[in-house]
């Protein structure tokens, strides 16, 4: 039977990662998960996280980034995720001020498309 990798979304473990980020990742690996989707980085750099994932046999399944971070520091975000080895950046939430109707959705869609083009 083919094995499909399963990752845990670290937002669901935000209390645990706030208390002990590396320890939480160790426990995730011990439980048998194949990877994690980041929702914050616990103050660790991309290289540190990549090393920890490699040590634990985990893969990066994606990561959350606020749209404001993409607007303000896209080049830094790109560099961070390249170093981490992450291929999938997710904007997890948009405030109502961002979309507020059909024109707002079109604007957000265009902006996200531009970010996606740069992140590739």
List the predicted regions and their residue ranges.
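Conserved, mostly hydrophobic/aromatic
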Residues: 8, 28, 36, 53, ...
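Active-site beta-loop-alpha junctions enriched in small/polar residues
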Residues: 9-13, 39-41, 65-68, 93-96
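Mobile, glycine- and charge-enriched loop segments
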Residues: 1-12, 50, 54-63
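Glycine-rich, proline-tolerant flexible connector loops at the mouths of alpha/beta enzymes
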Residues: 33-56, 99
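Catalytic domains of carbohydrate-active enzymes, especially glycoside hydrolases
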Residues: 22-44, 84-87
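Boundary/entry segment of secreted carbohydrate-active catalytic domains
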Residues: 1-19, 24, 34-37
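Active-site acidic/histidine proton-transfer and metal-coordination neighborhood
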Residues: 35, 59, 67-120
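Distinct, well-ordered alpha-helical segments
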Residues: 17-21, 47-52, 74-78
């Amino acid at each position: 039977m083919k094995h499909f990798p399963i990752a845990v979304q670290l937002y669901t473990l935000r209390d645990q990662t706030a208390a002990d980020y590396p320890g939480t990742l160790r426990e995730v690996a011990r439980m048998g998960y194949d990877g994690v989707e980041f929702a914050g980085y616990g103050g660790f750099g991309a290289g540190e996280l990549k090393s920890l994932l490699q040590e634990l046999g985990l893969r990066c399944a994606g990561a959350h980034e606020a749209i404001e971070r993409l607007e303000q520091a896209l080049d830094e975000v790109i560099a961070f995720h390249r170093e981490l080895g992450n291929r999938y950046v997710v904007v997890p939430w948009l405030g109502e001020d961002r979309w507020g109707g059909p024109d707002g959705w079109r604007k957000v869609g265009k902006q996200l498309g531009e970010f996606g083009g740069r992140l590739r």
